[in-house]
Regions:
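Arg/Lys-rich, positively charged N-terminal/basic patches that mediate binding to nucleic acids
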Residues: 1-37
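Alpha-helix capping and helix-coil boundary motifs
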Residues: 25, 44-48, 90-91
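Residue-level marker of positions within ordered structural domains that often coincide
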Residues: 15, 44, 80
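A short, surface-exposed loop/turn module that caps and links secondary-structure elements
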Residues: 41-64
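Short linear functional motifs in flexible/disordered or boundary regions
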Residues: 22, 51, 85-87
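Enriched for short, Lys/Arg-rich terminal
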Residues: 63-109
């Protein structure tokens, strides 16, 4: 699966260990690395490890959350034209591009 980031800053915080340690607790950084590694090797959401699939919440037509306690990652579909099922809904089995738009605490303001 291809993961893009909404900003260079978010990418740097997610990928660069030094910057990540500045903004995230060590446990959150480990979780983030595990999630991003799992997403990057999966062809689609269905290929994710079970422990991640169980933590995914579909919040709207093109948004998903991946939550670990109070730690959350927000993704949106990054396809220009998301694949759709015959009924017109997004076919999540065919989604292979996501954009990470937020990493942090679930209830942060």
């Amino acid at each position: 699966m291809i993961i893009s980031f909404i900003s260079k800053e978010l990418r740097d915080n997610a990928i660069n260990e030094f910057l990540g340690m500045q903004n995230l607790a060590p446990m959150s950084l480990m979780i983030l690395k595990t999630i991003l590694t799992s997403f990057s090797v999966a062809a689609s959401l269905n290929d994710l490890p079970r422990f991640l699939i169980e933590r995914i919440i579909y919040t709207s037509e093109n948004n998903i959350l991946c939550m670990f306690g109070d730690f959350v990652l927000h993704f949106i579909i990054a396809h220009e034209e998301p694949p759709r099922a015959q009924d017109g809904t997004i076919d999540w089995n065919l989604i292979s591009r996501l954009q990470l738009i937020y990493v942090g605490e679930k209830n942060a303001s």
